[in-house]
A protein has these predicted regions:
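Short, hydrophobic transmembrane alpha-helix segments
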Residues: 30-41
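Hydrophobic alpha-helical transmembrane segments of multi-pass integral membrane proteins
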Residues: 18-30, 50-58, 85-98, 119-129, ...
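Alpha-helical transmembrane segments and their helix-start/interface "positive-inside/aromatic belt" motifs
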Residues: 8-19, 41-44, 141-153
């Protein structure tokens, strides 16, 4: 019922939206993990809900600062959770497609690159659906843009801390090498990569 309510823009319960977001994103994570298989399926199924909902939890206070003039805290949380919930549901709907490619793709550098492109496209499509719903709720381009920037800024670092998502080899199925992930951050990595292109 919650998924149906999300799709039809009805008012689902907070518990229902949390459950739908967790279940849908877990399905997507499991599909991603099936590229390497084995424990990576379970790892990614656990990490994907932590990523989406954890990013929301960390971002919420900053989001409400921008929305406090127009929305109460409960309304801010409801709009943000609905956005994340719909994004997760779309990701869940794309899980069979992602699983088909993940399970049949050879574990190689070429297969890895193709899968990363597929995952990027899938997450982008889900994100567009979520942002469209967010804008229809907020009815403010500036507030929508601010929320998206806050969530993406936080989410990029969350994704870095929770990596690996797609393992390079069948032997690389670690759950969370946190000590290694704490060395540097997403933005430092991007800058280093860009500078490396010109050195």
């Amino acid at each position: 019922m919650t998924v149906h309510a999300l799709l039809l823009r009805r008012e689902p319960s907070v518990a229902g939206m949390l459950a739908a977001a967790a279940a849908s994103s877990a399905c997507f994570g499991a599909a991603v993990g099936s590229y390497t298989g084995r424990f990576q399926i379970l790892y990614d199924a656990v990490k994907m809900p932590v990523y989406l909902l954890g990013t929301l939890a960390i971002s919420f206070a900053a989001m409400h600062v921008f929305a406090a003039r127009d929305l109460r805290a409960g309304e801010t949380f409801g709009a943000a959770l609905e956005t994340v919930g719909l994004t997760a549901v779309v990701m869940g709907a794309l899980s069979p497609l992602v699983w088909l490619f993940s399970a049949s793709m050879p574990v190689s550098q070429q297969g890895y690159r193709i899968l990363i492109l597929l995952l990027t496209g899938s997450v982008a499509a889900a994100g567009i659906a979520g942002v469209a719903r967010l804008h229809s709720r907020l009815r403010s381009i500036r507030l929508t843009a601010a929320w998206v920037l806050i969530y993406q800024f936080t989410g990029a670092q969350m994704g870095w801390l929770l990596k690996p998502w797609v393992s390079h080899t069948a032997r690389d199925d670690r759950f969370l090498p946190l000590r290694q992930n704490l060395e540097g951050n997403f933005y430092e990595s991007v800058i280093t990569t860009i500078l490396g292109l010109f050195s």
